[in-house]
Amino acid sequence: MTEARELRAFNFEVRAEQNEQHGTYITGTPIVFDQETDMGWYTETISRDALKDTDLKDVRFLVGHNTSGIPLARSRNNNENSTMQMTVTERGMEIRVDLDTDNNQEARALYSAVKRGDMSGMSFMFVVDKDSWEDIDTDHPKRTIAGIRKVFEVSAVAFPAYEQTDIQAASDGQPLDSARASLESARRQVEEDRAAQAEAERRRALLERLENLTKEVKDNEP
């Protein structure tokens, strides 16, 4: 079965910095815990323990989710030698991306755009391992993501804010489509569960009726 990958993009603080240890780098927080986000179709919160068992190895850092381009950094084993280091804190998941501005023109352009404030958001692609829904039958349900199985990539994005929501509206509409697909999938599951429960209750009622009829027949035997 194909995994349902989801996109989220937010207007969190992204900083361009430089020091002797890491050279030219950017930092940011693509995932924030316990913060309600209006996804357009529903409200979503990522719980504090959502990254407890998440696979953060071999995550790529891209610009605008451009998977056909060369990654600007990579977490590999997510240690001090990685060009992208991902750290889970009390606030969420923070990243540091070491940029090769000496040899990579796109890295130089990104560093400049972040430093100038032209690039102000981060986005991540992931697969949910565990979630729950409240008020699923209402016009604006609530979703809590309790576990994220895998983060595939993190991107710097130019359009992190969607009108009247906190979700990115890219030209292809992917993040919003992803949110809508998640809600539709949850509602289908609820309907399937209700149908299964109704069928189980129907079978129980039928069995009870047969047992009562059998008892009546036995009671009326001479």
Language-model features, listed with the residues they occupy:
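Signature of dsDNA virion morphogenesis modules
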Residues: 1-184, 200, 215
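Terminal short linear interaction segments
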Residues: 184-222
